């Protein structure tokens, strides 16, 4: 049996742009992608903290160091620039792998700069 497990999480990213006229996807600063072990075209879940919307799309790489978080196409209707979002990717593994798996979690400040990277997340606790 394969389990779907959290692979990567970018916590409290600030949406910098919403581009309705783009084909689709989310553009993420390549530096943030690399830090979170996210690759281009990977499926990603976007959770908007400000309005509760959840959606899935795929990732395209933005300019390294740009701090861009831009929802494109139809996804742009679900967010506003300035909204805080949680970005999550998942992986499949068997139960034995899942027992020892640790996701990568990166925390961003209001400018989308990384202030913490961890592989541990429990309710109310960060290491």
Curated annotation (Swiss-Prot):
Supply the EC number(s). 4.1.1.11
Q: Which residues constitute the catalytic centre?
A: 25, 58
Pathway membership: Cofactor biosynthesis; (R)-pantothenate biosynthesis; beta-alanine from L-aspartate: step 1/1
Q: Which InterPro entries match?
A: Asp_de-COase-like_dom_sf (IPR009010), Asp_decarbox (IPR003190)
Q: Which organism's genome codes for this protein?
A: Clostridium kluyveri (strain ATCC 8527 / DSM 555 / NBRC 12016 / NCIMB 10680 / K1)
Biological process GO terms, please?
Answer: alanine biosynthetic process; pantothenate biosynthetic process
Positions annotated to bind substrate: 57, 73-75
Q: Which Gene Ontology terms cover its molecular function? A: aspartate 1-decarboxylase activity
Q: What is this protein called?
A: Aspartate 1-decarboxylase
What role is this protein assigned? Catalyzes the pyruvoyl-dependent decarboxylation of aspartate to produce beta-alanine.
- Could you tell me where this protein is found in the cell? Cytoplasm
Pfam families xrefs: Asp_decarbox (PF02261)
Q: What is its main location?
A: cytoplasm
Kindly list the cofactors needed.
pyruvate
Q: Which gene encodes it?
A: panD
User: By its UniProt entry, which PANTHER family does this protein fall under?
Assistant: ASPARTATE 1-DECARBOXYLASE (PTHR21012:SF0)
Q: Which GO terms describe its cellular component?
A: cytosol
| Catalyzed reactions per annotation | L-aspartate + H(+) = beta-alanine + CO2
Family, as annotated: Belongs to the PanD family.
Q: How is the cofactor bound?
A: Binds 1 pyruvoyl group covalently per subunit.
What processing steps or modifications follow its translation? Is synthesized initially as an inactive proenzyme, which is activated by self-cleavage at a specific serine bond to produce a beta-subunit with a hydroxyl group at its C-terminus and an alpha-subunit with a pyruvoyl group at its N-terminus.
Top-rank taxon of the source lineage equals Bacteria
Quaternary structure and interacting proteins, as annotated: Heterooctamer of four alpha and four beta subunits.
Q: Which residues cross the membrane?
A: none
* Pyruvic acid (Ser) modification, residue list: 25
């Amino acid at each position: 049996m394969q389990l779907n497990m959290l692979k990567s999480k970018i916590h409290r990213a600030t949406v910098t742009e919403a581009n309705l006229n783009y084909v689709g996807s989310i553009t993420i600063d390549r530096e943030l992608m690399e830090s979170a072990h996210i690759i281009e075209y990977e499926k990603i879940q976007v959770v908007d903290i400000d309005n509760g919307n959840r959606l899935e799309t795929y990732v395209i790489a933005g300019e390294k160091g740009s701090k861009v978080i831009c929802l494109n196409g139809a996804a742009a209707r679900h967010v506003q620039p300035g909204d805080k979002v949680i970005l999550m990717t998942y992986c499949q593994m068997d139960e034995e792998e899942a027992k020892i798996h640790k996701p990568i979690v990166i925390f961003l400040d209001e400018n989308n700069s990384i202030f913490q990277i961890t592989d541990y997340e429990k309710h109310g606790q960060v290491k």
